[in-house]
Amino acid sequence: MKGIKSKMLSRGKSQDTQKSSKKKESKKSNSHDSSKAPKESPSTDPNGSVIGAQNDFLTVPKHSGKKVPIDTTPTPRDEILLENVRTVRKQRSSLYHISENRNLVRLPSFTDVPVNKWHSLALEKLEQCCVVFDFNDPSTDLYGKEVKREALQDLIDLISVRKEAIDESLYPSIVHMFAVNVFRPLPPPSNPPGEIMDLEEDEPALEVAWPHLHLVYDFFLRFFESPSLNTSVAKVYINQKFIRKLLVLFDSEDPRERDFLKTTLHRIYGKFLSLRAFIRRSINNLFLQFVYENEQFNGIAELLEILGSIINGFALPLKEEHKIFLSRVLIPLHKAKSLPLYYPQIAYGIVQFVEKDSSVTEEVVLGLLRYWPKVNSSKEVLFLNEIEDIIEVMEPSEFLKIQVPLFHKLATSISSQNFQVAERALYFFNNDYFVHLVEENVDIILPIIYPALFEISKSHWNRVIHSMVCNVLKLFMDINPSLFDEVDAEYSESRRKKEDEEIIREERWTILENIAKENAMKLKSQNPTTVHSTTERLKKLSLDYTNG
């Protein structure tokens, strides 16, 4: 991330400041003690292997036990330093239920025992993997953590090489092991409510238990990919309750976990036909809650990616359930502030719908125009991108239904003073299929878009936009020169009328101002004749304005 370097630099400066202040104190307090503390030797496991040297687990120095009074009153210099320091986001752990008995014994590998003992050994290793460790303290249970990691890796190797070794009797133990390790309450979000995560600046909060967690996910995925998987037996354990708990985890801030969850849920959707309708309905409810209640959920992009592949497999004609999902769920998702975080996935799903059934084109385009951003230029560029993607798969007959509202919106975007919005709208005319549709309907389109093109060609501040507008005007001139001249003449006449109306309006306001000044000066005399004369002039002016 771009911001991480600046974060580390600012943090380093604060640490250097603290070190320099501590050096003076240490010289006074330790001048009488010239001996150095002996270095701690790394701890070893019962087999004699060194654990303290591993990078994943760090040792924590022991506290001396002495109470030292500390002055916590901040000085002015401390306040200045704290204002300029931006802390680096640390790894966080979910609220795991830590196992009480964490003393594990290393079991032999599957390659070291006969094949007829693999089943019992797999059960023992699965039981070991149900032990949950505390990764918030990296100095505890180092040996047990390593034993569990090896057991998970052995199970992965077994199911990868000998898929038939995992029989139906192991299904409950496998699902239980996955549930114990994965299903847990997630920590509160790092960002305050309503704040959108910046992918370039913000560091995601990573799960500290990932050394074990990713192996659990990997094993479970390989379990689903096994050709010997009996879904009729497994569906007893992979049920609706399991799916609900799995969907909750999509709110994890760790992108690595969300990626595993996406693949896991997709495998379940493909394997368990009886759960498909429930999965779609549950995702719909989650989206509705996101759109209409809190707009706080981290896994929208991953869920939309799953739905993109599901939409791709819809049979024709589309069911009413799928059309309702499009109109009430997928299109309203565009109004969320966090649209940039899941834009590629939702755009793919929308295009898939239009490509599957062209009859939904009008509803999709009008829905996007309804939620069109008014003040967010970067979001408006995304909408323009999506509209062009839809046009590329649009039937010419459907284009006729939406061309008028669409080109009114394009004219507004072309007139935008934000050069990125104007540039993106003008790039539509580099699309050959779009130009072909314009050529066939130029008599309707040109009168709508010509005023915006003409005004921008005369007044836009950006030279690139000015050049692109001139190219578009030349394109229309080449398509139909006579129509172009006619529209130009009509627009020139309308501009002349507006100028005349503006002159008349200014003259009338001048008359009103003069009457007001005259009235203010003469009302003091309270002359009834003057007041009557002023009233008559105002009535005459009102009649002239009404008659045009």
UniProtKB/Swiss-Prot annotation:
Main location: cytoplasm
Family annotation (InterPro entries): ARM-like, ARM-type_fold, PP2A_B56
Chain positions found as Phosphotyrosine: 96
Composition skew (Basic and acidic residues), residue ranges: 27-39
Keywords: Cytoplasm, Nucleus, Phosphoprotein
Gene Ontology CC entries for this record: cell division site; chromosome, centromeric region; cytoplasm; cytosol; inner kinetochore; meiotic spindle; mitotic actomyosin contractile ring; mitotic spindle pole body
Segments for region (Disordered): 1-75
Gene Ontology BP, a term: mitotic G1 cell size control checkpoint signaling
Subcellular localization, as worded in the UniProt entry: Cytoplasm; Nucleus
Keyword check for Cytoplasm: yes
Residues modified to Phosphoserine: 99, 109, 542
GO molecular function annotation: protein phosphatase activator activity; protein-macromolecule adaptor activity
Family: Belongs to the phosphatase 2A regulatory subunit B family.
Complexes and interactors: PP2A consists of a common heterodimeric core enzyme, composed of a 36 kDa catalytic subunit (subunit C) and a 65 kDa constant regulatory subunit (PR65 or subunit A), that associates with a variety of regulatory subunits. Proteins that associate with the core dimer include three families of regulatory subunits B (the R2/B/PR55/B55, R3/B''/PR72/PR130/PR59 and R5/B'/B56 families), the 48 kDa variable regulatory subunit, viral proteins, and cell signaling molecules.
Role this protein plays: The B regulatory subunit might modulate substrate selectivity and catalytic activity, and might also direct the localization of the catalytic enzyme to a particular subcellular compartment. Has a role in cell shape control and septum formation.
Protein name (Swiss-Prot/TrEMBL): Serine/threonine-protein phosphatase 2A 56 kDa regulatory subunit delta 1 isoform
Species name: Schizosaccharomyces pombe (strain 972 / ATCC 24843) (Fission yeast)
Gene symbol of the encoding locus: par1
